[in-house]
Structures are given as C-alpha cells and as structure tokens.
Amino acid sequence: MNKNEFLYKLINYPGQLYRRIQIKLQKSMLMECGEQVRFGRNVEISWSNCSIGDDVYIGDNAIFLCAHAPLHIGPHVMFGPNCSIITGDHRMDIIGTYMSKVTVAEKLPENDMTVVIEGDNWVGANALILKGVTIGKGAVIAAGAVVTHNVPPYSIVGGCLLK
C-alpha cells in the first residue's frame, strides 16, 4: 500500500466506523429484522413499526413513514434510491379545520393502512408506495411509479396512479 492509499484509508476510517454503528442501531430499532439487511445512506424509517425480512437492500435517501400503520417487507427485496413508502394520510373532510390541526384521535381507520411487500421484489428509484397497498411476490415496480392499488404477484408495473 502506498502513502496515498494509506492516507485515504486513514481519513475514511472514522466515517466507516460511524456507518457500522449507525446500521447496527437501525437494525435494533426495527419491529423485526432479518439477516443480511442493508441500508443505503440517509435512510429514514419509522423504525418501531416496520418489519424487514432476510436479504433486503434499501437504497440511499429512502423514506418509509409508517407511524400509525405497519410496514411489512418480505425477503429478497431491493429498493432503488429515493424510494418512499407512506402508510398514512391526512383527513381532509373536516371543513374549516387545517390539516395540521387534525389530531390523531380524529383520524379515521382508512387514513392509516398497512403496506405489505410480499418478497422477491424490485422497487425502482424514486418509486412511491401509498397506504393500504400489497405488492405481490415477485412483482417489479418501475422507477418513478406511484403505487396506489395492489400489485399482483409476478407483474411489472410503472407509471403514475397505478390501478
């Protein structure tokens, strides 16, 4: 190893150590965590309401918001960068009340619904999966897709507002 390689490794060592500790903490906060689960950088998940199966990769900058309804991710799933999953919604039918003023107690059951990703799936970059969706085993979600309805097993879907 030459001097430049040594200096490069020395400079990056604190960041690598921090990253290992961060991933260990992330896994410990999950409701359930399988083997060989890997997280990209800047991943934000509602940790205590999310279960992840074996051999799952979640790409950089993913945001999984599942505060009031759970998210279940099966085994062998890959998420590209910038994917989002949101298991909740805001109530918009209370006339004269700002959405930010509606309390959790005022939410309806249909405002928060479980998302299930059955396993053996590939979710492309910038995909958005919304509340109440089940993605069947082996299904592929194209980059940039907005998924609002269930996806059958072993299908390939893309585009906005999938039906």
Task: Give residue ranges: language-model regions.
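Extended, small-residue-rich solenoid/repeat segments and analogous flexible loops
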Residues: M1-I45
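Low-complexity, intrinsically disordered short peptide segments enriched in small/polar/basic residues
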Residues: Y8, Y18, N126, A143-G144
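Short, conserved clusters of charged catalytic residues that mark active-site
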Residues: R20-I21, H68, G124, A142
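Flexible, glycine/small-residue-enriched loop-and-beta-strand segment within the central core
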Residues: E44-I52, Y57-K131, C160-L161
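C-terminal/domain-terminus segments
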Residues: I129-K163
